[in-house]
Amino acid sequence: MKNIFKMISLFVLVLFSFFYTDKVMNLINKNDPLMNKIDLLKDKYEILPVNAILEDNTIIPGVKGKIVDLDKSYDNMKVSGIFREDYLIYNELLPSELLSNNMDKYIIKGNSSNNKISLLVLGDSNNIDKINKDNITIFLNHKDISINNIKKLSKNSIYTYGNNGIYSDEILSNDNTIINRISNNKSIYCLSKDKNSDTLTVCNKNNMYVVIPNIIGDYVDVKNNISNGSIILLNNINNLDIIIKYIKSKGYDIVSLEELLTE
């Protein structure tokens, strides 16, 4: 019985010692000029999240923000004792609605908080050499999805366009297996030119989002309608180089679809 009492007493003593030490260290840290400086400046580096825009069955994704982790930032700087901006450690601030919780909605655009846009083209075995350009997002027809074709498009993000825009479980299973194994991206997007409940159902079933471009057309359509966050699907690639040049001349950054829609 005495041994049990001694063990309990020792455990309580150790626990109290840890608690007391932690309290003392927290007090010391709070009085450290470095900690005070990080605490004083942390709001300067805070970036609030941009919330998603939901309307009916559509969504424009939000963008994550960030906030300084005071304790981790202090731990990262205390050896040198000097405040360094590049040593700050951040925690994410999530938008109020996430894409992962709204897979049953059509993505109609990227967030407009920056100058990024995505340029989509429909690829096939006949035009692969012409569309193999940096950051162009390519949707290949089911019949054109092959190891050889995907290897030729190593610069690009690649997704399946099903059978000319018609998706099925069998097509998605086959195409996604090849794309996920060979390409540099994960096949998580289906493409639709308008709202289609069948497309939404089968793609959601396969853990994929459905994207409806907000601009579909050619040079004139791009010129008249482009804005931050635009998802552009070209009807053909006849003026691809001219369109790319125009987009860049207006200060837009052409990025992959995945990057554009990253929260």
Regions found by a protein language model. Give the residues of each.
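N-terminal hydrophobic targeting signals that begin at the initiator methionine
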Residues: 1-2
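Ser/Thr/Pro/Gly-rich low-complexity linker/stalk segments immediately outside membranes or between
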Residues: 24-38
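Non-catalytic propeptide/linker segments at domain boundaries
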Residues: 34-114
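Active-site beta->alpha N-cap acidic-glycine motif
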Residues: 77-169
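Catalytic domains of cell-wall/extracellular-matrix polysaccharide-remodeling enzymes
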Residues: 145-155, 159-263
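Generic N-terminal initiation segments characterized by hydrophobic and/or small/turn-forming residues
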Residues: 7-10, 31, 254-257
